[in-house]
Amino acid sequence: MSEIALEAWGEHEALLLKPPRSPLSIPPPKPRTAVLFPRREGFYTELGGYLPEVRLRFETYGTLSRRRDNAVLVFHALTGSAHLAGTYDEETFRSLSPLEQAFGREGWWDSLVGPGRILDPALYYVVSANHLGSCYGSTGPLSLDPHTGRPYGRDFPPLTIRDLARAQARLLDHLGVEKAIVIGGSLGGMVALEFALMYPERVKKLVVLAAPARHGPWARAFNHLSRQAILQDPEYQKGNPAPKGMALARGIAMMSYRAPEGFEARWGAEPELGETYLDYQGEKFLRRFHAESYLVLSRAMDTHDVGRGRGGVEEALKRLRAIPSLFVGIDTDLLYPAWEVRQAAKAAGARYREIKSPHGHDAFLIETDQVEEILDAFLP
């Protein structure tokens, strides 16, 4: 089977198979990097670690209004990047790291950002930043430790979702944004929840897509297996990259991101091609993500519990009732079942909507028509 056929059922299906919503497009984005916690201050993590300096790579689309009231902060999922929308020009693309180039020229939610789209840069100042701990330009295991001059690697301190939210809040300070609409999916939805609980005065509206209030035993089990695939790779144990482990980790994760309905519809006539698809996704993942960032961020996900130190999940979610909130589940999501998202929405006094799709957890990235319709009824 051709690579394009496999890719068309991969992460960028919406980009490859759906026509553009508008003949217009946004200008080629220019990624920027900001030092948000300089060396004179440093960054102390929730679990007691320390980073001498924290930088975040980010992109913006549109212009902040004079009243500074049109910002939208979008948080990406586990292996996403700051590149939310648009297409890099050749000069920008050549300036990127090999991992960023492997991620691709097109933004990961491109079909929702642009003229006439739900996140129109003519109306909104859209901000998207690569999470702390990732490998796409923000401070992470690949970054140089200022004290040693060498990459942190396996010495990078463990993070929590609250650490990720705190770094994103400092980015808003850097950009002069006091308050924003906050949107996140999957891991990004967890960060959005924590951001709203930590900084409620900074959230105009909250949108949580395909994310739970607590990372429970089912989701943690998938992360555990993916990490074990990496940690048990003989090459990783020798201190080298983990090619076999990373490919297997991705395959395990893809099974949690998809659903039986989608696999049957796509591969039912030739079941062996489903295996080829997983192998392809694993090989592709090797080129575009780093094992240490995968370990750091997946462990951060496993710390996610909005109720920790707040009297339990339900009591914590009650604090969100003053914020207009929308929770979006997916009817075939195996990773974070719809009932889990619906339950969180009820406790938060939030609206609840559900994406109908055979594609499982990844539907929030694929079913952009439904996502746009849902957001259109909620955003101002």
Swiss-Prot record:
<dbReference type="InterPro" id="IPR029058">
    <property type="entry name" value="AB_hydrolase_fold"/>
</dbReference>
<dbReference type="GO" id="GO:0005737">
    <property type="term" value="C:cytoplasm"/>
</dbReference>
<dbReference type="GO" id="GO:0009092">
    <property type="term" value="P:homoserine metabolic process"/>
</dbReference>
<dbReference type="InterPro" id="IPR008220">
    <property type="entry name" value="HAT_MetX-like"/>
</dbReference>
<keyword id="KW-0808">Transferase</keyword>
<dbReference type="GO" id="GO:0009086">
    <property type="term" value="P:methionine biosynthetic process"/>
</dbReference>
<dbReference type="Pfam" id="PF00561">
    <property type="entry name" value="Abhydrolase_1"/>
</dbReference>
<comment type="pathway">
    <text>Amino-acid biosynthesis; L-methionine biosynthesis via de novo pathway; O-acetyl-L-homoserine from L-homoserine: step 1/1.</text>
</comment>
<keyword id="KW-0486">Methionine biosynthesis</keyword>
<feature type="active site">
    <location>
        <position position="361"/>
    </location>
</feature>
<feature type="binding site">
    <location>
        <position position="362"/>
    </location>
    <ligand>
        <name>substrate</name>
    </ligand>
</feature>
<dbReference type="InterPro" id="IPR000073">
    <property type="entry name" value="AB_hydrolase_1"/>
</dbReference>
<keyword id="KW-0012">Acyltransferase</keyword>
<keyword id="KW-0028">Amino-acid biosynthesis</keyword>
<feature type="active site" description="Nucleophile">
    <location>
        <position position="186"/>
    </location>
</feature>
<comment type="subunit">
    <text>Homodimer.</text>
</comment>
<feature type="domain" description="AB hydrolase-1">
    <location>
        <begin position="70"/>
        <end position="366"/>
    </location>
</feature>
<comment type="similarity">
    <text>Belongs to the AB hydrolase superfamily. MetX family.</text>
</comment>
<keyword id="KW-0963">Cytoplasm</keyword>
<feature type="binding site">
    <location>
        <position position="250"/>
    </location>
    <ligand>
        <name>substrate</name>
    </ligand>
</feature>
<protein>
    <recommendedName>
        <fullName>Homoserine O-acetyltransferase</fullName>
        <ecNumber>2.3.1.31</ecNumber>
    </recommendedName>
</protein>
<feature type="active site">
    <location>
        <position position="333"/>
    </location>
</feature>
<dbReference type="GO" id="GO:0004414">
    <property type="term" value="F:homoserine O-acetyltransferase activity"/>
</dbReference>
<comment type="function">
    <text>Transfers an acetyl group from acetyl-CoA to L-homoserine, forming acetyl-L-homoserine.</text>
</comment>
